[in-house]
Amino acid sequence: MSTCIQKLFEEQVVRTPDEVAVIFKKETLTYKELNEKSNQLARLLREGGVGPDTVVGIMVERSIEMVVGIFGILKAGGAYLPLSPNHPSSRLQFIIEDSGAKLILTQKQILHRFQDSLKADMLALDSISYEGKGENLECINKPSDLVYVIYTSGSTGKPKGVMIEHSALINRIEWMQEAYPISSKDTILQKTPYTFDVSVWEMFWWAIVGAKVCILAPGMEKFPQAIIETTESNDVTIMHFVPSMLSAFLHYLDVTGETNRIKSLKQVFVSGEALLSQHINRFNKLLNFSNGTLLTNLYGPTEATIDVTAYDCPTHEITEGSVPIGRPIKNIEMFVVDKYGNKLPEGHIGELCISGIGLARGYVNRPQLTAEKFVQYSLDTRIYKTGDLALIRSDGNIEFHGRIDFQVKVNGLRIELGEIESCLMSCEGVLQCAVIVRQESEMVVKLIAFYESENDIELERLKKYLRLFLPDYMIPNSFVRVNEMPLTDSGKIDRKVLALLGSDKYSHHTTLVGGSVNEESSKDS
């Protein structure tokens, strides 16, 4: 195994220097051009002190600068920290300080927005001249050095940083190439926001085999028409969806009959939510039977480097509701345990545990949480306790059976309900609160916040306050004021009762007293 991911890319540059590597709208970069630009940036960064385990932030829109910036950070020897320019300044500042990032690579228009609110040095990638030596730098990384740090939602009210090493990423990318080989004839669509780790394989898989990456225009990942147009005009062969977005995409194809426009598409990967049999059946009807496109279900937490299982979906009609998450990828082992940590046999539901080369180093500045989640299970086995319930079938495939805690996925985005609740509790006037998830349809999942207060609080005030700390995807769709929180016999908030209260008849801002509607005022969220 190579020591670092950038070395694999540099070896590919030697093989295919003049082949197109990156496509963004009407711009392209060849392998040689991308290598030279990222080398020029890397020299600048290394002269500034970037080296192994140095975390460098990158806050850009999807663009060619995004690719050059990430590759430049790695070539300098550092680890990249993706930051969303759409997140609140307070959240960004916490991540910057917590990670120890002293430098943020950005773009001019983003720099102007944040230069007064963020305490960090910022460098605009679109203002660099990219002159000087374009030759490769000496690789100064070991397999155990950090390659990236991605922050996920945290139950304590603050996001937590997951530290991934080069060896883990290389194992994941090399497995993907062995299992689903691609070549210079293939083009991967990069459409996942880079603050989520699915983007990592979209960012690097193509780069080690001579394929292309086509970068979808910012914000267009939610629009099927834009995905179809980009796929058609760039002969995209590989893409990823969250199941709920796949459902919306398939619905669009069914209504418009535009399946023939994406005949180049040969493989779709899904992850982030439970895949259902109806997704597979509709996919096969619209894409497999006509175009021969294949569907693969992936599963994995950020703490185990993107994905740890894969299940190739059948091309015939299936009737069972849930779809397996598959078998472990190479150099990964998985098993389920009971509440005492004892391994369970096949067919028994327990907590899913992961071991192997894909495990993260741990959480940034969270030694206690790292010790709780990353456990030395035996003398030679370190595991990550996922918090997911699962069982292993007799054929070796794993079935997902929900969560132990209050972590949820909404449109594929990982959310700790405790983080929302912690922020809501800090809002003046809120005495107690709880947030639940409601599945309204196959494509629509909503967050509903229940809060207890002496007086009613204006909806816009609640939303405005939460937006100071949380990204938009974590802002509840509905707020329900209750006179008194329902409690279980043990004194905990009874979320099952709240789930019954959070039905369609309650609008975006509703007041409940004793479980019945007291006052209701509807507003669009």
Curated annotation (Swiss-Prot):
Its EC number is 6.2.1.72. One of its GO terms (biological process) is secondary metabolite biosynthetic process. It comes from the Bacteria. SUPFAM superfamilies: Acetyl-CoA synthetase-like. Pathway: Antibiotic biosynthesis. It catalyses: holo-[peptidyl-carrier protein] + L-serine + ATP = L-seryl-[peptidyl-carrier protein] + AMP + diphosphate. Keywords: Antibiotic biosynthesis, ATP-binding, Ligase, Nucleotide-binding. GO terms for cellular component: cytosol. PROSITE patterns: AMP_BINDING. The keyword Nucleotide-binding applies. Disruption phenotype: Disruption of the gene abolishes ZmA production. GO terms for molecular function: ATP binding; ligase activity; phosphopantetheine binding. Belongs to the ATP-dependent AMP-binding enzyme family. NCBIfam families: AA-adenyl-dom. Involved in the biosynthesis of the linear aminopolyol antibiotic zwittermicin A (ZmA). Specifically adenylates L-serine and loads it onto the holo form of ZmaH via a thioester linkage to the phosphopanthetheine moiety. This is Zwittermicin A synthase ZmaJ. The lineage of its organism: Bacteria, Bacillati, Bacillota, Bacilli, Bacillales. The gene is zmaJ.
